């Protein structure tokens, strides 16, 4: 498989991020959709589509990312794989089941090595808080979680 692109929502401050990776193999596309839970749960959802129509791919993207309310940014393969590894290891650490067809991504969790750190990736997956209203919304969400 050849990496085509990956994109993620900049919604880490709200707790969850949607990540999509698209690969190409034999002129067919494989989409992997991950819901990453930054509040300790790891990978919360996973779906893959093999050679979907454009409409099917868009529908799954909106199901995954539409409610997260933030912009989507392209990331390189190293960042995408780092995030899957990082959040997948949270599932293992907390004894939570990995979702979906685990065989499709388990090697990323068990075998992928990167020199990246979460501190390096954090500015990419988080939108800066730019005004008082955003700060109040963030604090309200944070307090309600506890």
Give a label for each model feature:
Residues 1-146:
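Non-catalytic terminal/accessory regions
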């Amino acid at each position: 498989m050849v990496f085509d692109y990956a994109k993620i929502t900049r919604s880490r401050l709200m707790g969850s991020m949607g990540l999509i990776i698209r690969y190409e193999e034999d002129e067919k596309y494989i989409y992997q959709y991950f819901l990453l839970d930054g509040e300790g749960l790891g990978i919360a959802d996973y779906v893959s589509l093999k050679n979907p129509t454009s409409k099917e791919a868009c529908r799954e993207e909106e199901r995954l990312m539409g409610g997260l309310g933030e912009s989507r940014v392209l990331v390189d393969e190293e960042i995408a794989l780092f995030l899957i590894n990082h959040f997948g290891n949270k599932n293992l650490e907390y004894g939570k089941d990995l979702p979906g067809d685990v065989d499709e991504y388990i090697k990323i969790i068990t075998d992928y090595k990167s020199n990246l750190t979460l501190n390096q990736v954090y500015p990419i997956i988080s939108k800066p808080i730019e005004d008082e209203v955003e700060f109040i919304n963030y604090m309200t969400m944070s307090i309600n979680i506890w």
